[in-house]
């Protein structure tokens, strides 16, 4: 069973959902860059304070800061049996850093899962999201609606659509993703690590396909 993996894919393709499911199924940590940033920023670590300078301005955190957070995370005991990266690496430079980091500890990546979805499916998925401003619960108008339309099941707050979930923002993010990530996809394809997964399918079908890939020798 492959246990050291990376999930890549455009926003809304479902890579985060799959990473969480596989993490629970295989009992290995799901390492999301967003979670790493939040943990360091909340803990006011030197890396967190450095990252905050950029996130507060809506800028990407520089590679050297992100890479050091990854190095710190991979030094923890819970990654010995495997790990799932979600949102990292973002560029070939980060991928090379990760390769070298794993080499030092006699480890290597098993597979890179590219969850791809059509722009139309992604736009429909994301624009349907609604978030509770109080508890942070996420719903979807079609796929996971609240019991009462527009109202959070947990606290009765009125659900909102985040700016990030609006159509214009999504189209812009998809364009940036394609431009930024194509070199990374090419890098892993060249190393024969890339496996494509059709993200247009239902969640459970995607999970089944992912598990089949992980079980291949």
From Swiss-Prot:
Keywords: ATP-binding, Cytoplasm, Kinase, Metal-binding, Nucleotide biosynthesis, Nucleotide-binding, Transferase, Zinc. Residues 32-61 are annotated as: NMP. GO terms for molecular function: adenylate kinase activity; ATP binding; zinc ion binding. Zn(2+) binds at residues 132, 135, 152, 155. AMP binds at residues 33, 38, 59-61, 87-90, 94, 162, 173. Monomer. This is Adenylate kinase. It comes from Acholeplasma laidlawii (strain PG-8A).
